[in-house]
Amino acid sequence: MRIVEEDEKNGVIELVPETLDDLWHLSHIIEEGDLLSARTTRRIQDTSGEKIRSDRGVKKTFYLGIRVETVSFHIYTGRLRATGVIERGPEDLVPMGSHHTLEVKLNTPLRIQKEHWSRWTLKRLRMAVRASKNLKAIILVMEDDVAELGLIRQYGVEYRGPITGHIPGKRIQQRDRGKLRREFYESIVESLQKYGDLETIIIAGPGFYKSDFYDYLMERYPEIAKKAVLENTGTGGRAGISEVLRKGTVERVSSEKRIASEIRNVNEFLEKLARDPDSVVYGKVEVMDAINMGAVEKLLVLDRVVSREDIEGYLDMVESMGGSVVLISSEHEGGKQLESLGGLAGILRFKIQ
């Protein structure tokens, strides 16, 4: 996520979503009553009555602002849509007061105007912006004995390499080929270890080397292997990196990792609930009472609860007392389990019963 402009006086923020996670965050930042503006495309028909044959109209792109009524995000298609009444736009093209659905698209500017930006909503927005500034992933493309690295950053791809193994043909003894291949793999590992805080490594390529290197990581560097996923490409080098980007693999894997982390947090709560019920609380009243006592070490909050319930002060209270707040999406099984518990659950630092 990138903020383009911020007009605090008028409650306007213009931003550019860059990942599927950004769209997910925006699905809970954009609320009913917001004025949402973006470029949109509509088919405009000739209403002059002069045409005899049916007129399918002409597609035109223009800036449109709607007063939001509903917001929907479909996690599997990655589509974020907001529906509402048109308040701003070219009056010769669209009737004011009619309904329209805006689709929020990646890498396309979007303006959100609110009567009041809550502290927690702004904090969530800043978190998304900070996350996008970090190194998102490394794409490692391997073809034969040549490897190329693509560091995926907010502004684009930063290339590193090539790393060359100089592994000769099969006429050389297998023992020597194995030694040279290990040296090649070690040089790649050395490059990867420079980015220790990285969460995602996509190992790609057209041939056998990518899976062989992954097996090598599993055996010798399991801490790196657990961050890695495999992807097929038709070619190596920078063209292979571009192919991975076109497939949307980085966005898909990043989203899957966020979901996996959320599910782990819900499972941690459920395990404690089964093993020692007094070490956790759930339900709105019980959780808020525990927060007031300073007993909540980790608070799990369903995304729908954040947008619908007046709990911002309680979220701030947990963090001010050294606890953590974890937002859980309602789009996966972990979120549905949390929803069945009332949408709020806390892991306690001390028992209150």
Curated annotation (Swiss-Prot):
Biological process terms in GO annotation: nonfunctional rRNA decay; nuclear-transcribed mRNA catabolic process, no-go decay; nuclear-transcribed mRNA catabolic process, non-stop decay; ribosome disassembly; RNA surveillance
Cellular component, GO, one term: cytoplasm
Compartments reported by the entry: Cytoplasm
Main location: cytoplasm
EC number, UniProt record: 3.1.-.-
InterPro entries xref list: eFR1_2_sf, eRF1_1_Pelota, eRF1_2, eRF1_3, Pelota/DOM34_N, Pelota_arc, Ribosomal_eL30-like_sf, Transl-rel_pelota
Key words of the record: Cytoplasm, Endonuclease, Hydrolase, Metal-binding, Nuclease
One Pfam family per UniProt: eRF1_2
Organism superkingdom: Archaea
The UniProt record lists the keyword Plastid: no
Top-level enzyme category: hydrolase
Cofactors (names): a divalent metal cation
A GO term for molecular function: metal ion binding
Similarity field: Belongs to the eukaryotic release factor 1 family. Pelota subfamily.
Domain remark from Swiss-Prot or TrEMBL: The N-terminal domain has the RNA-binding Sm fold. It harbors the endoribonuclease activity.
PANTHER family (alphabetical): PELOTA, PROTEIN PELOTA HOMOLOG
Function: May function in recognizing stalled ribosomes, interact with stem-loop structures in stalled mRNA molecules, and effect endonucleolytic cleavage of the mRNA. May play a role in the release non-functional ribosomes and degradation of damaged mRNAs. Has endoribonuclease activity.
Assembly and interaction partners: Monomer.
Protein name: Protein pelota homolog
Protein species of origin: Methanothermobacter thermautotrophicus (strain ATCC 29096 / DSM 1053 / JCM 10044 / NBRC 100330 / Delta H) (Methanobacterium thermoautotrophicum)
Lineage of the species this protein comes from: Archaea, Methanobacteriati, Methanobacteriota, Methanomada group, Methanobacteria
